[in-house]
Amino acid sequence: MSRMIFLALLVLLLLGACQSQVDLSQPPEIRYGEDVCTKCGMIISEARYAAAFYTVQGEARRFDDIGGLFIYHAENQEDVAQFWVHDYETEEWIKADQAFYVTSDQLHTPMGFGLIAFSEQDRAQRLASKSNTMVMSFDEILMSFVDGSAEHEHFDS
C-alpha cells in the first residue's frame, strides 16, 4: 500500500513539474501596469516599447524599453532562448532577430533609448525617413550596445 501511495505522489510531482515548465518558443507574458522592468525596476506600461526573453533555463526577463533589453544582455550575457520585441504600430510580439529597428533622439521611449521595432521593413523605412535616420538589423543594434555606442537618455513624462 505504501508503495502505491509513493508511486501516486511521484506521478503527481512529475505532472506538476511538467505543467510549470515554460514554452521557450513563446514570449514571456507581461502584465502591463504590474510587471517591472528587469533592468530599471520601473513598471512596464506600454506594449509598443516592451521587450522580453526567456533564459535557456526558463527564467523570464521583461523590459519597459527595447534598449533596456539590449543593454541588460550586453552587461549580463545570459544564454537566451529567444529575444522578443513588440511591433511599434501593431503591438504584436515579433522575434527580435526578425525585426527592423529605427532609433532616433526624436523617439521618446520609456528609458530614452529612442529605439523601436517593426515586423515589416517598409513601415520601419517610412518612419526612418521621417526621422532622418536609417533602419537597422538586430545584429547592428546588438553590436551598438555591446560596443557602447548606443545612447541612453531618460525622459520625464
Protein language model annotation of sequence segments:
Residues 119-157:
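C-terminal partner/receptor-binding element of secreted or periplasmic proteins
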Residues 14-17:
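C-terminal motif of bacterial Sec signal peptides marking the signal peptidase cleavage site
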Residues 19-21:
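Bacterial signal peptide processing site
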Residues 62-94, 100-101:
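Mature extracytoplasmic domains of secretory-pathway proteins
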Residues 25-33:
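Short, flexible, mixed-charge glycine/proline-rich loop motifs
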Residues 32-71:
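Post-signal-peptide N-terminal segment of Sec-exported extracytoplasmic proteins
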Residues 46-54, 94-109:
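Short aromatic-glycine-(Arg/Gly/Cys) micro-motifs in beta-strand/loop hairpins
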Residues 2-9:
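Sec-dependent signal peptide recognition
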